[in-house]
Amino acid sequence: MENSRFLSCKYRSSFGSSNARRIRAKCEIPAVVYGQGNDVLHLKIKSSEFNKKFAKFTDNTVLILDDGKVERCVFVKDVAENIASKLIYHIDFYEVDKRVELEKYIPIKLVGASIGVKEGGILTVLKEQVKVRSLPLDLPEFIELDLTPVNKGDSVLLKDLVLPSNVKLAESDDNLEVVIIK
């Protein structure tokens, strides 16, 4: 498993604004984990470790919080930050069961220069994301759509998207158009 997914964490028992300031003064970030029907867990994470990885996160990035005993599969739900000072005040994580498939919208990343566009066609994007189903750790950050072979007058349907082998389309109609070149 990718090392970039792992974040070390420690449990914390002190709460409130003054305690959060003390945690941040020690170059750590207060955080909470909720979901899975469990009580809310209060954690702290090293700022340097989180900041190093944070720029690479998307809404679909699944992280593994590791306290040395238990690994928790989570998504970043919310990050409270001061944009001017680039200081992160607090993180909310949402825990999911890594053994249970889930449905999530994944962005479609367009790559390549279409033959149809080179011939003067106009590219119209009708769908920017696609609903897929997979285990959390198998979720892709994006679905790549190569436009290179698409000619003028052609369209690409949802069912034409190339998905990783462990990811399934979860849209109700796989005949919907993703892009059209007119």
From Swiss-Prot:
MF annotations from Gene Ontology: 5S rRNA binding; structural constituent of ribosome
Lineage, top-rank taxon, reads Bacteria
What's an example GO cellular component term for this entry? cytosolic large ribosomal subunit
InterPro entries (UniProt xref): Rbsml_bL25/Gln-tRNA_synth_N, Ribosomal_bL25/Gln-tRNA_synth, Ribosomal_bL25_b-dom, Ribosomal_bL25_C, Ribosomal_bL25_long, Ribosomal_L25_dom, Ribosomal_uL5_bac-type
Name a single GO biological process. translation
Which Gene3D superfamilies does the protein's record reference?
Answer: Ribosomal protein L25, beta domain, Ribosomal Protein L25, Chain P
* Keywords from the UniProt entry: Ribonucleoprotein, Ribosomal protein, RNA-binding, rRNA-binding
Q: Name one Pfam family in it.
A: Ribosomal_TL5_C
Q: Tell me the CDD domains matching this sequence.
A: Ribosomal_L25_TL5_CTC
- On whether Lipid biosynthesis is a keyword of this UniProt record, the answer is no
Which HAMAP family does the UniProt entry name for this protein?
A: Ribosomal_bL25_CTC
Q: What does this protein do?
A: This is one of the proteins that binds to the 5S RNA in the ribosome where it forms part of the central protuberance.
Q: How does it assemble?
A: Part of the 50S ribosomal subunit; part of the 5S rRNA/L5/L18/L25 subcomplex. Contacts the 5S rRNA. Binds to the 5S rRNA independently of L5 and L18.
Give the family this protein belongs to, as stated in its UniProt record. Answer: Belongs to the bacterial ribosomal protein bL25 family. CTC subfamily.
> What is the protein name given in its UniProt record?
Large ribosomal subunit protein bL25
Native species of this protein? Answer: Borreliella afzelii (strain PKo) (Borrelia afzelii)
Taxonomic path? Bacteria, Pseudomonadati, Spirochaetota, Spirochaetia, Spirochaetales
